[in-house]
Amino acid sequence: MHRKFLDKNKGMIFIYDKVEIINIWMYNTYIPLDIIFLKNKNIKNLKKNASPCLQLPCESYSSREPIDTVIEINAGMSDQLKLKIGDNLEIFSGTNIVF
């Protein structure tokens, strides 16, 4: 990732071609993040405050079940937005996410 900051209310979205179990690590990530794992716009797992990792080995965070999308946002944002497993997210134009 190599980011040292992420603007408030910004994030990164990763859309996968295939529905599968996804493991995310934080190698070369300098800031803590909340990782949201989704399938069909439904939150299936949520890792809050995933720690930065600058040296291997790094902890891996699993979706625990097959998913098709991952969203990474600033640590703490999922609590501020009151996100929880089972919530649905609508994604418009690949840039705006409605909670």
Language model feature labels by segment:
Residues M1-F99:
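Compact, glycine-rich, soluble single-domain proteins
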